[in-house]
Amino acid sequence: MWTQRAGVDIIKHSEGSDPAAVVFDAVKAGIARDADVIICDTAGRLHNKKNLMDELKKIARIVNNNAPDSRVETLLVLDATTGQNAVNQARQFNEVADITGIILTKLDGTAKGGIIISITDDLQVPVKLVTVGEKIDDIQPFSARDFVEALFE
């Protein structure tokens, strides 16, 4: 559905397939098609599920080994409604995936996402994007000024 809305290709396997194999095929297809960007969505991973974190580590290794000259962004998607647990979650994801940025979701609700200050300070990674809705146009570049102003509204 999202790929159709965005007008992009999708590489997928049947349900239950090894996620790392899907990423391997996606990287190879992206290189063969001379793609500018390859997005690998590993949604649904919980930092306290060792097998899922091991898969994530394997995925990162596959990307780095098969596209060594590519610029790789590893973005952690955090829910703005998540509290203190988000700090621990971010640390654990960073240990296996070398996070380069954060996407903060659900800023359209009552959550202000103040925990992101602790996370960015702790990990020294920037917030790159925020979402303020569920449409593709609701993904916006992060503005520190707007974020701080919203915290104090």
Predicted segment positions?
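Nucleotide-state-sensitive switch-loop elements of NTP-binding domains
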Residues: 1-73, 97, 110, 114, ...
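C-terminal structured domain segments across diverse proteins
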Residues: 83-84, 92-96
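Short beta-alpha junctions and helix-cap segments that line functional grooves
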Residues: 88-89, 114-116
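Helical hairpin unit composed of two closely spaced alpha helices linked by a short loop
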Residues: 100-101
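Phosphate-centric recognition/catalysis
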Residues: 105
